[in-house]
Each structure stands twice: as C-alpha cells, then as structure tokens.
C-alpha cells in the first residue's frame, strides 16, 4: 500500500462493506456490515491505541461525517445504543441503500484517515490488513 489517501481508504472501505453486506444489500444489511467492519477494525486498533482512543477517533469521525451527512445526528434512540458506532448504524439503517453506502464509505475513510494521522501510514496499513484481510486478497486493490 503506497498511499493511504482519502480516496484509497474509501475504496478499501467500500470493498469491505460490499464483502460483508453481499450483493444488492439493503440499508439494514449495509448497516450491519458497517458494524461488523468497525468491530474488526476496533478489535485490532484497541491494543495499540486503547479503547478510549478508538472511542475518541469514532467520536471525531462522527463529528466530521455530520458535516457532509447531517442526517447522522437525527433519530437517536439511546436505549438501543451499544458502543460508539451505534448512532451511525442506526442512521444508516434508515437511508436509501446508495446513500447509506456512500456515507458508510466516507465514515470509514475518515476513521482510517484519522488513524493514519495518529499512528502513521505503515502501522495503519498493517492494522487494515489484519482487520480486513479479504480486502487485500487482490494486490491490485492496494495500488489503484
């Protein structure tokens, strides 16, 4: 992986979401895929930056994503929240699948971009490969 720019991170995220959600997935399946992808990434990131670090990056990601996707702040149901990504998942479930896909890709690109800023590109690349190995099965994915 040579450059983890926003576009490259977004492509990786969209590939992971598509793999987890399956073909022609609806918004609920996409939201579940986003939750699973987040859990995978949080699992490999937490030993390095701590759960508090993961939560802080998630909070900052949500704040930044709300600029482009203001609907991410609407329709809160706190009693159902389980973890810092719950608000995003809840909101993704209520969107058109194309909109949910676009937003989820942007959310993951933002989260991983913040991770690059925080721990550097080489270490982030290693974490992404560990969290989402299927996204890197095709070497051309890394270089395009």
Where are each of the predicted segments found?
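Long, compositionally biased intrinsically disordered regulatory segments in eukaryotic proteins
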Residues: 1-144
């Amino acid at each position: 992986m040579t450059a983890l720019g926003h576009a490259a991170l977004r492509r990786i995220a969209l590939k992971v979401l598509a793999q987890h959600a399956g073909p022609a997935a609806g918004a609920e399946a996409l939201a579940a895929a986003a939750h699973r992808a987040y859990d995978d990434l949080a699992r490999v990131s937490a030993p390095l930056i701590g759960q508090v670090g993961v939560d802080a990056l998630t909070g900052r990601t949500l704040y930044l994503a709300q600029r482009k996707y203001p609907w991410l702040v609407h329709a809160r149901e706190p009693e159902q929240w389980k973890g810092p990504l719950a608000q995003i998942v809840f909101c993704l479930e209520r969107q058109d699948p194309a909109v949910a896909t676009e937003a989820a890709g942007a959310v993951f690109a933002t989260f991983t971009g913040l991770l690059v800023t925080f721990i550097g590109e080489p270490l982030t690349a290693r974490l992404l490969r560990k969290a989402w190995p299927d996204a890197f099965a095709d070497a051309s994915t890394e270089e395009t």
